């Protein structure tokens, strides 16, 4: 737990340096469930709210084993088209669709015990 707090502290310190002008709003969006239509709408609303509030950056905290490829692709596209920097923080897992979403971010940070990968599309009959 101590290492986790240390990593968050350095991540916040980095963003404080990065957004050093008068407006220091940094949004955090947590994706901790299966990637699907609900998480897609949640991310889209969070990015829109961050933009409306003139946030300087968004931290996307990921802990997911994946989900549907269509929603992961939509989320990745929204991140790539975001007018503000989006950084992924892999809190524990970013597998499958979670990895695809993390790769779309401007930068990726991971907790030392976190894992990311297995970003393979699975065809189901």
Where are these regions (language model features)?
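Bacterial N-terminal signal peptides that target proteins for export
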Residues: 1-8
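Bacterial N-terminal signal peptides
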Residues: 8-17
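Soluble extramembrane regions of membrane proteins in the secretory/endomembrane system
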Residues: 21-125
């Amino acid at each position: 737990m101590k290492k986790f707090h240390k990593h968050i502290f350095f991540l916040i310190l980095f963003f404080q340096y990065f957004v050093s002008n008068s407006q220091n709003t940094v949004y955090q969006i947590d994706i901790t469930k299966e990637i699907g239509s609900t998480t897609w709408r949640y991310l889209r609303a969070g990015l829109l709210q961050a933009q409306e509030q003139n946030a300087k950056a968004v931290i996307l905290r990921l802990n997911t084993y994946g989900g549907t490829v269509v929603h992961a692709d939509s989320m990745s596209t929204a991140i790539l088209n975001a007018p503000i920097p989006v950084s992924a923080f892999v809190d524990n897992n970013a597998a499958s669709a979670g990895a695809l979403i993390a790769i779309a971010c401007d930068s990726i940070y991971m907790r030392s015990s976190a894992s990311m990968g297995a970003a393979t599309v699975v065809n189901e009959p």
